[in-house]
């Protein structure tokens, strides 16, 4: 398994929906979460870049699918934040359609990172994202963000509770605590991404050799 240098990650493009994404080749790992789950902060922490993903003071601002390339053919995908109360209902439905379409149809999608505030995990739409991924045979890493907001005992209790709850999905769902501020869980995230990004390599090599 190759240890990728995530600091080399760079922005490629924004797309309003799956039809405007580049060709469905290589490997993609998508990041999804409610609008205030700390998704942009997690991407910036992962890549050790202050402004790779824009952190907005106005949750629900990111309405586009944003693509970042780690190395050639290996991409991180920042999906639109979901579930923000002040976003019009029609826009919410549009986002949810776009998210569902991406998870169901994108062949290069290898893994899904679902981010949730550790204090308010497993809201309806979080569960919907995990369910979609499991039904599409996509592995999931749940990051319980803002873990620094809880004392150690409460943090462990939440982590154990969510780990227990996700068993009901009957899929490959891993759960870790994460803090952008304290850099907690970053190594676990990198390890998971490395494993996802290396999974298709043998198949590609076989095809090249034919």
Curated annotation (Swiss-Prot):
Amino-acid positions noted as binding GTP in the UniProt annotation, renumbered to this chain: 33-40, 60-64, 78-81, 145-148, 178-180
Entry cofactors: Mg(2+)
Pfam families the record matches: MMR_HSR1
GO molecular function: GTP binding; metal ion binding
Gene3D superfamilies: P-loop containing nucleotide triphosphate hydrolases (3.40.50.300)
Residues binding Mg(2+): 40, 62
Domain of life (superkingdom): Bacteria
Domain spans labelled EngB-type G: 25-199
Segment forming the signal sequence: none
UniProtKB keywords: Cell cycle, Cell division, GTP-binding, Magnesium, Metal-binding, Nucleotide-binding, Septation
One term under GO cellular component: cytosol
Biological role stated in the UniProt entry: Necessary for normal cell division and for the maintenance of normal septation.
Protein family membership: Belongs to the TRAFAC class TrmE-Era-EngA-EngB-Septin-like GTPase superfamily. EngB GTPase family.
The protein's name: Probable GTP-binding protein EngB
